[in-house]
Amino acid sequence: MTFNPETGKLYIQDVTLRVGMHAILHMYGTESVRTIAKALDDAGVDAIEVSHGDGLNGTSFNYGFGAHTDWEWIEAAADVIKNAVLTTLLVPGIGTVEELRRAYALGVRSVRVATHCTEADVAKQHIGIARDLGMDVSGFLMMSHMIDAEALAQQALLMESYGAHCVYVTDSGGALDMDGVRDRLRAYDRVLKPETQRGIHAHHNLSLGVANSIVAAQEGAVRIDASLAGMGAGAGNAPLEVFVAAADRKGWNHGCDVMALMDAAEDIIRPLQDRPVRVDRETLSLGYAGVYSSFLRHAEKAAEQYGLDTREILIELGKRRMVGGQEDMIVDVALDLVSARAA
């Protein structure tokens, strides 16, 4: 373990303006981005991530079209951020090194390079170029619940070897419990250098986002992802104001104003939600089935279109071990379920 929350300062990475895009179908207006980014910056978070929900260049028929371009969102945030590090996310194959360079030119100084948990090797070029640009770089191993701890650690080792300053346990499905988080971070400790930071990206589908983040910090994760009011895919991410309040009670140094975060969550974020970000029968099914949280809104749309229960689709997606990037298969699964019902 390389970090101790009892003695060190946590690095609070807000994801409201990236993962939170999924919750409102990538429809943040630029004025909302300014308002949210300023509130987060004023409240003392260390970093603010901004992009389409699926990362740079994510706007598409497959993932959903954004209300604005990544550049318009990033520029809006950059206009008001004075202290926090402006961050973005890039999924190789969706975003390219050209998008990365443009983001850097607009003021982005930290990037999370995200791959499926078994595909770290596709991140080599992007991590290397980000390092060449002088950026802070994290490796982001999505759907970390889908392989065991030792296998995940080997993927983390690859990301470290490419130059990542930090490697995350990324619980995209909100399917990990505290033991799963603990096991994965301990496996990281067995293979990663002490100077390589660890991070946790939790989702709240089983209502464990905050608990998993606390356990992660206790196991050496210094970078904690969270979002205002949990704004994010599925049941959302670890709610930022809740995590900070819990960390406060433990006496941990997080550098944030918990009351300001509460106000931002309640006054700014909740009114933007066209669908409540919460644990309900659909979002719980994501964690139960181990399904990519971003599939929620796509599955709800398909269920309505074909007269199905959203849970049926999500459970079947889990059985088929579908992963991020296979959003186009959700309709195929729905049609298969309709055919099976008619048979």
From Swiss-Prot:
The EC class name is: lyase
> Per the UniProt record, which EC number(s) apply here?
4.1.3.39
Active-site residues, as the UniProt record annotates them: H22 (proton acceptor)
Query: Which PROSITE patterns does the entry link to?
Result: PYR_CT
The UniProt GO MF terms for this protein read: 2-isopropylmalate synthase activity; 4-hydroxy-2-oxovalerate aldolase activity; manganese ion binding
Q: Which intervals hold domain Pyruvate carboxyltransferase?
A: 10-262
**InterPro entries per the UniProt record, alphabetical:** 2-IPM_HCS-like, 4OH_2_O-val_aldolase, Aldolase_TIM, DmpG_comm, DRE_TIM_HOA, PYR_CT
Detail which positions bind Mn(2+). H201, H203
Biological processes, Gene Ontology terms:
catabolic process; L-leucine biosynthetic process
Q: Which residues bind substrate?
A: S172, H201, Y292
Q: Which reaction does it catalyse?
A: (S)-4-hydroxy-2-oxopentanoate = acetaldehyde + pyruvate
**This protein's UniProt keywords:** Aromatic hydrocarbons catabolism, Lyase, Manganese, Metal-binding
The answer, when asked if DNA damage is one of the entry's keywords, is no
Q: Where is this site: Transition state stabilizer?
A: R18
Is Calcium among this UniProt entry's keywords?
no
Q: Which PANTHER family match?
A: 2-ISOPROPYLMALATE SYNTHASE 1, CHLOROPLASTIC-RELATED, HOMOCITRATE SYNTHASE-RELATED
UniProt family annotation: Belongs to the 4-hydroxy-2-oxovalerate aldolase family.
Q: What is this protein called?
A: 4-hydroxy-2-oxovalerate aldolase
Species of the source: Sphingobium yanoikuyae (Sphingomonas yanoikuyae)
Record gene name: xylK
